[in-house]
Curated annotation (Swiss-Prot):
The gene is atpE2. InterPro entries: ATP_synth_csu_bac/chlpt, ATP_synth_F0_csu, ATP_synth_F0_csu_DDCD_BS, ATP_synth_F0_csu_sf, ATPase_proteolipid_c-like_dom, F/V-ATP_Csub_sf. Its main location: membrane. The lineage of its organism: Bacteria, Pseudomonadati, Pseudomonadota, Alphaproteobacteria, Rhodobacterales. Coiled coil: none annotated. This is ATP synthase subunit c 2.
Length: 83
């Protein structure tokens, strides 16, 4: 493979990693926030507990997007095949 081909493949791989890798967390976070808002609307006195649990869950969901970003950065800037 030529260096140009490897560079193009790295750019496309990074774009797919960030593009597709952010869809899951975005949908998951949207559903989690919607469910938390619905639960708080039903039981306002439990808002503190629900908010705390929501933030922990959102942090766990967001790790997938962060991992995809790290993979994309590795493909772009630390790719061992680019020479």
């Amino acid at each position: 493979m030529t260096p140009e081909t490897v560079q193009i493949a790295s750019i496309l791989g990074a774009a797919f990693a960030v593009g597709i890798g952010s869809l899951g967390p975005a949908l998951g976070e949207g559903r989690a926030v919607a469910a938390a808002m619905e639960a708080i609307a039903r039981q306002p006195e439990a808002a503190g507990t629900l908010s705390r649990t929501l933030f922990v869950g959102l942090a766990m969901i967001e790790t997938m997007a962060i991992y995809c970003l790290v993979i994309a950065l590795l493909l772009l800037f630390a790719n061992p095949f680019t020479g």
